[in-house]
C-alpha cells in the first residue's frame, strides 16, 4: 500500500479492508494521460501565479513529460498499490524530481482534478466513438445503394403496412444513428468546461488564471460555481444517455435483422462470417453478434440508471459516492465501441433477397393506395377508408388480393374506380405516389442517400 496523499491527519495506518474498498486505481488508471495533461497545465498556471519558481516549474514539467512518455510506451507500468491515478502520478513525480513534485498539488483538490480528468477523457474518446458510428452509417448507406429499386413491406405493430424501398428502410437506421452522433457532440460540448480553480469546494486561494488554463487545455469556458463543479457529473450522465440511446438504436437494428434474416421472413441473409452454428443442430445459422448487441443494450441503459440513482441523493459538494461514475462510464464506452464494430461488420456483409421482399410488398398492404385513389376521384377520405375496409374484408374471406380483381369487380365497390386503377395500385406505383421529401419516393430516397454521402465525406 503506497502512502496516501491525506495521511498526515491520521495517527494509524488505514485498515486494508477499508482502504482497499476505496481504491480506484485499477480502473481510473485509464485517466493517466488526462491526469498528466492536466497537471502540466496546472504547473504552468502555478508558475504564472508566482507560486512556483522557474526551477521547480521546469523540473515538474520535465518530470511529467517523462512520466507521460513512459506510460504511453509501457501501459503495464501504470500499476501499483496507489489509491488512485492522481496518487500514482504524484508518487512517480516526487521520485523523479523530489520536493518540487510535492509543490504541484498546491491550491488544487482531487475533487476538481478528477472532474478535469473525466472531462478531458470524454473530449478525447468521444470522437473515436463517432468514427465508429460513421462507419456503421456508411455500411447502411452502402447497402441502400446496392438495394437499388428493390421493394419491401414496411411494418407497424409488426404487421405489414405499406410498400417502401428497401433502401428507405436501411436509411431509417442511418437516420437514427446520425442523431446519436449529434448527441455525442452535445455530450462532448457539455464536458467542455474547465473545473480547475474550484478547489475542494470554495475555490482556490491562489491567483490562478483560469482563462489561461481553459485556453491551454482547449476548454470553451470555465465552470460558473465552485460548489457545483465539485459534485457535477451531469456531463457524465449526458454521455451515458447518448450511449444508452445509441445502444437502443443498435438493439432495434439487431432485432430487425434477427427477424428478417430468419426463415419466416427471408428478406436478408447473414454472411457465414456474421453467424455461428449450433453444437447439436447441424442446420443452424445463428445471428449471435446481433443477439449480443441486443443484449448489451440493457447493460448500457443500466449504467445510465445507476449513475442517476447515485447522483440523486447526494448533498451539495463532493462525496465519495461519485467514485462510482467511472466504471459505468468506461464500460459504457467499451460496450458501444464493440457493438458498433460488430453491427457495421454484420450490416456490411448482408445479402438481400429482392424477390422475396417484392412478393411480400404486394397484396392487401396496398389498401391505403386504393383509398388514396378514391380520394383523388373526389370521395372523402373517411368514406374511402370505409369502402376499402369492406373490400379488404371480402378479399380476406375469398383469400384473394387487389391484383386479382377485374375492372368490373373493382367497380362493384365504387363507380369511381377507372380504367387506370390496376396500374395505380401496385407496390412500385405506391412508392412513386409519396410526395414529401422524407418519404420513400425514389427521388427522395436518392436525395437522402446523397445527403448522407456528403455528410460522411465531411467527416
Outline where the language-model segments fall:
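A helix-coil-helix interface module used to build multimeric assemblies
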Residues: 1-203, 208-212, 276-277, 292, ...
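Glycine-rich cofactor/substrate-binding loops
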Residues: 2-38, 92, 99-100, 266, ...
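A short linear-motif detector with a strong N-terminal bias
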Residues: 25, 82-84, 94-95, 238, ...
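Helix N-cap/coil-helix junction residues
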Residues: 51-52, 219, 379, 400
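Charged, flexible cofactor/metal-binding loops and thiol motifs
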Residues: 118-126, 130, 145, 153, ...
Amino acid at each position: 500500500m503506497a502512502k496516501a496523499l491525506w495521511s498526515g491527519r491520521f495517527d494509524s495506518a488505514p485498515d486494508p479492508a477499508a482502504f482497499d474498498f476505496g481504491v480506484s486505481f485499477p480502473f481510473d488508471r485509464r485517466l493517466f494521460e488526462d491526469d498528466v495533461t492536466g497537471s502540466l497545465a496546472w504547473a504552468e498556471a502555478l508558475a504564472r501565479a508566482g507560486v512556483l519558481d522557474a526551477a521547480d516549474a521546469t523540473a515538474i514539467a520535465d518530470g511529467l513529460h517523462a512520466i507521460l512518455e513512459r506510460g504511453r510506451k509501457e501501459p503495464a507500468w501504470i500499476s501499483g498499490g496507489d489509491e488512485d491515478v492522481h496518487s500514482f502520478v504524484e508518487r512517480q513525480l516526487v521520485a523523479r524530481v523530489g520536493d518540487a513534485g510535492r509543490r504541484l498539488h498546491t491550491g488544487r483538490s482531487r475533487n476538481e482534478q478528477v472532474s478535469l480528468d473525466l472531462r478531458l477523457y470524454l473530449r478525447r474518446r468521444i470522437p473515436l466513438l463517432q468514427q465508429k458510428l460513421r462507419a456503421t452509417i456508411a455500411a447502411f448507406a452502402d447497402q441502400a445503394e446496392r438495394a437499388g429499386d428493390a421493394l419491401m413491406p414496411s411494418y407497424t405493430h409488426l404487421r405489414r403496412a405499406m410498400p417502401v424501398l428497401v433502401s428507405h428502410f436501411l436509411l431509417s437506421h442511418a437516420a437514427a444513428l446520425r442523431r446519436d452522433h449529434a448527441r455525442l457532440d452535445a455530450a462532448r460540448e457539455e464536458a467542455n468546461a474547465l473545473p480547475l480553480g474550484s478547489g475542494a469546494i470554495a475555490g482556490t486561494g491562489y491567483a490562478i488564471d483560469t482563462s489561461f488554463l481553459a485556453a491551454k487545455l482547449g476548454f470553451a469556458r470555465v465552470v460558473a460555481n465552485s460548489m457545483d463543479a465539485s459534485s457535477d457529473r451531469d456531463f457524465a450522465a449526458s454521455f451515458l444517455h447518448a450511449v444508452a440511446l445509441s445502444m437502443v438504436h443498435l438493439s432495434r437494428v439487431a432485432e430487425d435483422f434477427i427477424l428478417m434474416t430468419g426463415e419466416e421472413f427471408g428478406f436478408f441473409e447473414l454472411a457465414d462470417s456474421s453467424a455461428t452454428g449450433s453444437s447439436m443442430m447441424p442446420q443452424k445459422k445463428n445471428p449471435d453478434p446481433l443477439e449480443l448487441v441486443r443484449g448489451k443494450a440493457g447493460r448500457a441503459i443500466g449504467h445510465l440508471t445507476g449513475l442517476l440513482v447515485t447522483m440523486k441523493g447526494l448533498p451539495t459538494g463532493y462525496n465519495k459516492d461519485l467514485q462510482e461514475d467511472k466504471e459505468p462510464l468506461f464500460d459504457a464506452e467499451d460496450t458501444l465501441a464493440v457493438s458498433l464494430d460488430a453491427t457495421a461488420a454484420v450490416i456490411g456483409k448482408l445479402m438481400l433477397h429482392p424477390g422475396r421482399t417484392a412478393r411480400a410488398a404486394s397484396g392487401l398492404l396496398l389498401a391505403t393506395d386504393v383509398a388514396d385513389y378514391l380520394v383523388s376521384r373526389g370521395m372523402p377520405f373517411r368514406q374511402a377508408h370505409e369502402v376499402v375496409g369492406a373490400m379488404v374484408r371480402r378479399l380476406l374471406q375469398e383469400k384473394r388480393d387487389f391484383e386479382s380483381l377485374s375492372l368490373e369487380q373493382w367497380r362493384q365497390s365504387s363507380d369511381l374506380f377507372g380504367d387506370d386503377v390496376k396500374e395505380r395500385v401496385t407496390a412500385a406505383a405506391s412508392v412513386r405516389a409519396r410526395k414529401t421529401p422524407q418519404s420513400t419516393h425514389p427521388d427522395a430516397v436518392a436525395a437522402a442517400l446523397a445527403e448522407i454521402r456528403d455528410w460522411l465525406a465531411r467527416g
